[in-house]
Amino acid sequence: MRLGCSGRRRRLLRAALLRLVVLVLVAPPRRCAGESATCLAVYREGGAPAVFQSAHCPRWTLLAPSAGSGGEGDGDRRSSSSSPPPPPHPRGCHVAVDRGRRRSQEDRAVCALGIRIPFIGIYHKIKEVDVGVVAVFDGHNGAEASEMASKLLLEYFLLHVYFLLDGIYSIMFRKSTGKLTYKEVTILNNVINLYKEDQSSHSKGSCWALPAILDRSFHMEVLKESLLRAVHDVDLTFSKEALRNNFESGSTAAVILIVDGQIIAANVGDSKAFLCSESHDSSIDKKTSVVSGKRRRKRNSNNRDDFALANYDGPFYNVKELTKDHHPDREDERSRVEAAGGYVLEWAGVHRVNGELALSRAIGDVPYKRYGVIPTPELTEWQSLSANDTFLIASSDGVFEKMTMQDVCDLMLRVKLGVNQELGSFAVTQRNLADYVVDLALEKGTTDNVAAVIVPLGSHYSSKVTLEDWYMLEENSKTSISPLQTIPYQQKSGRFNVQ
């Protein structure tokens, strides 16, 4: 299985995973694994970075550029006449990234929807799970960390899904390799406990019926663990690169998985992820907030529009926050920093680690790791999307320099209602929603880079794409992963924007 970027590409990783689960279901007990024993050992020892670099895993090749190879660090993402045009962005993703008043662009964004991942379900049936990945990376002290994170996150995530399933299926079907050695017991305690209980009652080396763990919760835990490992490995890869090249940059990471109507958020730093959810709160305060927001956006507001909003009896949007900022003035974050020998000092009105770094968790920032700055994400639990959840939004902190999350949700309502004269008629499928957020942040005077990803939710807005849009299987049937085009763009005054 070779993942490449040639024109003859067809359903790559999905085909690889399908082959794996079919092999597990039909192969003899000692031949259940899809990878060689040596490659599995490489994975267990060093994770995704080791697999992509090892000669023992020739089927896996990462073609993404290193952090020091250039890219969008200058803030103007220009297309080259010698390079093929970027692939179309998945429908349903609204992405905008703007340099703002900064000299360089250090923000990055990723949005991939409709990734179909096959799992073995109960009764030996193959179940394809629809997965979406939304992420924002806010770089600082350079774009190297955010650039590498945006290039590697999805590749690492999907590789971990593949290898975790390979290892788990091998154990469940009593493959001769015995037990997992790469922290597999951390996937889920109740899953592993079921393994131990069932292993004690079955003869060694025999395949046995799939246990009850292969219900809808099994794949959710595999995906969650894959996300955690992907973020860990992105930091590991970048930190090694930073030491080699004397990079001092770091990055936030706000990542959301969307899986079969449920979401989970992993956060490192102070980028934000949240939902705008419909509420039939018709209070005067809510109406005043929306109307005044409109007036702030355009001083010469149309009185008719104000009247329409003031008399609007439909649902408003409330914020459902999915992430918490990692600043060193947070009590638990400060305690960790101080326990590691660092200190927190307020400078220019901002609490900073050792008086310098304004974050207590980050990808990269290698000089501060010894002082308690960690890349470990703070993770929510899986939560079901309700019928009222209308927009999923991830943004860098540049958006919130002059705005609040509620301001963003109020803006989405005004856009949806189409009452702003300058917005014209509104159609989700024809206009980039993220542009509205970025434009308003800049209009309000933010000086930072700005990035926003918006995914409209609900059946009215849903538009699925298949894994074929991202991964294709080449004819030579070997495996390598090519970099995904994370922000297909049209240049617009230093901005990347796409719908």
Swiss-Prot record:
The keyword NAD does not apply. Binds 2 magnesium or manganese ions per subunit. It catalyses: O-phospho-L-seryl-[protein] + H2O = L-seryl-[protein] + phosphate; O-phospho-L-threonyl-[protein] + H2O = L-threonyl-[protein] + phosphate. It is an enzyme of class 3 (hydrolase). The keyword Magnesium applies. PROSITE patterns: PPM_2. Mn(2+) 1 binds at D138, G139. Residues 67-101, 286-306 are annotated as: Disordered. Its EC number is 3.1.3.16. GO terms for biological process: regulation of intracellular signal transduction. Its cofactor is Mg(2+); Mn(2+). PANTHER family: PROTEIN PHOSPHATASE. This is Putative protein phosphatase 2C 76. It comes from Oryza sativa subsp. japonica.
